[in-house]
């Protein structure tokens, strides 16, 4: 059982894997029909990951909650051995239909699975990517621990999530009293502060290497579209300084090798 905020109050909703999966299948189909480009590789969170991921040829990369597979295809075109995992069969069906014509250097694998219980062996991947996903999971800590488990020692995590402590986040909190709380009508949504997420990342055993942010938006009046200052996203130094105001937060972390973890545990 999970509690969500909807409208002006709390509403209790009972979820199990099948009911939530069914809702996400419907959501993906509706979003795809309304906007086929939704969540494509030009989304700001994928742009952040692309900026930091570095050379990936030959690397084993997992994208958790890959959706319709746009970023999976981009990574595979760059020479990575990519696995995409998503909870929704509808999203994976859409992803599979686009793979044959994608011109991939290496085949990509698509697997249905739960981000909170990843169906992969330990130490399977060099890099794990998760974009705008953990805020839609009932158990975020289990998901972060699972991403750590399937990453090899020395491997990296690149993760993005909305920043609810900025101007737009405050505006969204205000809007809770006027509209349902779900972002894009997603079936499940939790608003968590980035410092808490960083704490969970560290507790799972990751070493944080870098944080950043993107999409600086400033609401003017309720009901009006916010102004986005794209110039603030173009320079990394400026973006870093203003990251507390960003709409999307980014963290890159590394799984400690076993020797380093053993020394740390002995202290």
Question: How would you name each of these model-derived features?
Answer:
Residues 260-263, 267:
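Intrinsic disorder/low-complexity segments
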Residues 132-136:
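Short catalytic micro-motifs in class I SAM-dependent methyltransferases
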Residues 63, 137-138:
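HTH DNA-binding helix-turn interface
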Residues 2-117, 127-131, 144, 213, ...:
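Conserved N-terminal segment of class I S-adenosyl-L-methionine
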Residues 114-117, 121-122, 139:
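Acidic/polar helix N-cap motif
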Residues 27, 34-43, 91-94, 138-146, ...:
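S-adenosyl-L-methionine-dependent methyltransferase catalytic module, highlighting the catalytic core
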């Amino acid at each position: 059982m999970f509690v969500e905020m909807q409208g002006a109050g709390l509403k209790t909703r009972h979820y199990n894997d099948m009911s939530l999966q069914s809702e996400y299948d419907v959501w993906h189909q509706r979003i795809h029909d309304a906007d086929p480009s939704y969540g494509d590789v030009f989304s700001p969170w994928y742009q952040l990951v692309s900026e930091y991921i570095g050379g990936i040829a030959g690397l084993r990369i997992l994208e958790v909650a890959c959706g319709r597979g746009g970023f999976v295809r981009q990574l595979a075109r760059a020479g990575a051995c990519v696995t995409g995992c998503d909870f929704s069969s509808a999203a994976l069906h859409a992803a599979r239909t686009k793979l044959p014509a994608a011109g991939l250097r290496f085949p990509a694998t698509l697997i249905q699975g739960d981000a909170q219980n990843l169906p992969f062996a330990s130490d399977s991947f060099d890099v794990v990517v998760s974009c705008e996903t953990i805020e839609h999971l009932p158990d975020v800590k289990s998901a972060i621990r699972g991403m750590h488990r399937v990453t090899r020692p020395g491997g990296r995590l690149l993760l993005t999530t909305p920043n609810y402590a900025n101007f737009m986040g405050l505006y969204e909190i205000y809007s809770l009293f006027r509209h349902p709380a779900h972002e894009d009508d997603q079936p499940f949504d939790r608003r968590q502060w980035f410092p808490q997420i960083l704490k969970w990342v560290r507790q799972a055993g990751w070493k944080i290497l870098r944080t950043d942010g993107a999409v600086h938006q400033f609401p003017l009046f309720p009901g009006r579209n916010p102004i986005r200052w794209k110039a603030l996203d173009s320079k990394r130094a400026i973006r870093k300084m203003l990251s507390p105001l960003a709409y999307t937060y980014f963290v890159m972390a590394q799984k400690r090798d076993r020797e380093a973890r053993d020394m740390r545990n002995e202290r």
